[in-house]
Amino acid sequence: MYVRTYDGLEIGLGQPQPPKAPQPPLQKTFVSNVITYKDSQQKCQSTNCAIFVPSALRDQAKIDLVVFFHGLDTCSPTYDSDPQKVVKNFRLDDQVDKATRKAALVVPLVLWNSNDRNLGYIRTAWSAAYVNSFVEEVLDEIAKASRVRPTLDHLIIGGHSAAYDILVPLAEQFDCGESETKKGALAKLSRVVAMDIPHYPRHAKALEDWARSRTSVKFFLAFAKAGTPPDIWKQWRLKNASVPLPGNLQFWNMTKDLHCDLPGKYFGVFL
């Protein structure tokens, strides 16, 4: 006499359930209803955004999210007002997909209009409160193409070049203890990747102060072999050599790489 068991069998089918095929990565574009503003020409501007979610993170209940802010459209090839081209030109999707730390990615298209920058419209549009709301909007957009609506585990912010006009004001809000930096997505900030960001001494100070104000957050500053940002940073550190860097801030001089090489070669390294 024997007892027949059904471990590993699907009831009623008599066969083991085949493993589910992995979902393909999610790639989509959406228009943000959070980052909207009236520009210097009194025209309403919206923000097109590209999302990439690696296959390994599809339908996960909790995810890390990378927000990457690009610079001016001066690198080759150009991105031509298309956030998906920013992703492809800098291989951000491939880097995120292959990174040890798995994370979803969103790249908003920033309209780097000189008048709008000078008048503060862009930095206002990306101030702390709007960043928090934007992250929630991104999670909602991911949910539309998923079985679950993910919640945020950790936030990673990255930026290149002219993105100083977003990262520096945000850094100063953190340093001043602005309430929105202590709640929502920004309360879950775990990493900042700043590539050729400082263009003025104030920017270098802001990044250092940001690191000091959030000792649990890791900061990575990457610099090209030549140009204004590495020069500014070198001068700043020489002037303040007696002040040690925060222990959670590292800077890297990429002595063989040009300004436009940085995001495409190294962004994934710092995730």
PLM feature segments, named:
Residues 70, 158-170:
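Glycine-rich nucleophile elbow surrounding the catalytic serine of serine-hydrolase chemistry
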Residues 1-65, 103, 238:
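A domain-start/cap signature at the N-terminus of enzymes
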Residues 211, 220-271:
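C-terminal catalytic histidine-bearing segment of alpha/beta-hydrolase fold enzymes
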Residues 148-161, 192:
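Alpha/beta-hydrolase fold nucleophile elbow
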Residues 62-65, 69-141:
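Active-site machinery of serine-nucleophile hydrolases
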Residues 169-188:
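Conserved hydrolase catalytic core segment
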